[in-house]
Amino acid sequence: MNYGKKSPQLWAAIENEEQRQQDTIELIASENIVSDAVREAQGSVLTNKYAEGYPNKRYYGGCEFIDQVEQLAIDYAKKLFNAAYVNVQPHSGSQANMAVYQALLKPGDVILGMGMDAGGHLTHGATVNFSGKLYKTYGYGLNPDTEELDYDEIMALAKKVKPQLIVAGASAYSRIIDWQAFRKIADEVGAYLMVDMAHIAGLVATGTHPSPLPIADVVTTTTHKTLRGPRGGMILSKSTELGRKINSAVFPGIQGGPLEHVIAGKAQAFYEDLQPEYAEYIQQVVKNAQAMEKVFNTSKQIRVVSGKTENHLLVLDLTKTGLTGKDAQNLLDRVHITTNKEAIPNDPRSPFITSGLRIGTPAITSRGFKEEDAQKVAELISTALTNPTDEERLQEVAKGVHELTTKYPLN
């Protein structure tokens, strides 16, 4: 009987990935390193259990302990964000956004969200995404001079297109977002305001970024990224009335059985996020990003979009290096620094090529990196990107990476 026999090929790949993570400086802004406790929760016997429905309202028997797990996740999240309503069942951030759209809109309604070339997400209205196929979507951009959100321009666009829903939030924007300005715009045109805080949820939880919870109608987030939890989604609101609509949109609207082993991982992560040391971690995340910003701002060839960061990430304009974002990503992969290509504002190149890079500090901060380490990483990146064909310099960069990953092991 081979029940439980491990696949050698599968486990070799898993072990290789673990070694890759150990040997690599991870700068993808949406990635982080979960605790052993989160991994244990995800690998628990909860993966065996089906539990359609919600706590104390299940369609299956034997859910008494599952109910406890899911309720803990809800209660921890409510406390973490001071929310009246929480749904922890969405399988991803995209599923969370889809559920909100289904709860509040009908097909063909107008959504106004941040354009992808300005730092928005696929689910904020991209034509290739369900959001752009089911709804009529428009994208707002950035002020071309400051590369920051221009709330007057967004107001003018909202008055023109008359959206039923405005989406605030971004996947590649390094500045503080003014939720009250978005509330004013939404009220002016009679639209719902949804905030997608997937990237900055950890900053919101600790007060490092202003909270949208008292201001927005609905807030969505992922549970990984800065929250340092398992991959998944969550929906929050100050309104329990809207919450009832959203619950129906999640189940039975777009999902069946929830992934209770992942929800257990979410509960464990939220518990960790409620501890005092988590706020210290988030503060260090921002300090590390700002330490990297200082290095890049001294470069003659690498430009920080908008000139600074106020959160966990930076977008780098590589135009003067002669490298595309794809070139730079591949080059840095060679020296064991993982990043992702990113469009810069009004990027002339395709999303598959781009003219920029997005880098973030959550994962390196989880490993223990401080400001001086983050500065060293930025210097290594600058050396590589400005000497892309100098093998000797690239070997020096790889050596510097190895020194840092050895100094700060993954576990």
From Swiss-Prot:
Q: Record's Pfam families?
A: SHMT
Q: Which GO terms describe its molecular function?
A: glycine hydroxymethyltransferase activity; pyridoxal phosphate binding
Tell me one GO biological process term.
Answer: glycine biosynthetic process from serine
Cellular component per GO?
A: cytosol
- Names of the cofactor(s): pyridoxal 5'-phosphate
Catalyzed chemical reaction(s): (6R)-5,10-methylene-5,6,7,8-tetrahydrofolate + glycine + H2O = (6S)-5,6,7,8-tetrahydrofolate + L-serine
The record describes the protein's role as:
Catalyzes the reversible interconversion of serine and glycine with tetrahydrofolate (THF) serving as the one-carbon carrier. This reaction serves as the major source of one-carbon groups required for the biosynthesis of purines, thymidylate, methionine, and other important biomolecules. Also exhibits THF-independent aldolase activity toward beta-hydroxyamino acids, producing glycine and aldehydes, via a retro-aldol mechanism.
Instruction: Give the family, as the similarity comment puts it.
Output: Belongs to the SHMT family.
Protein name (record): Serine hydroxymethyltransferase
Upper lineage is:
Bacteria, Bacillati, Bacillota, Bacilli, Lactobacillales
Q: Which gene holds the coding sequence for this protein?
A: glyA
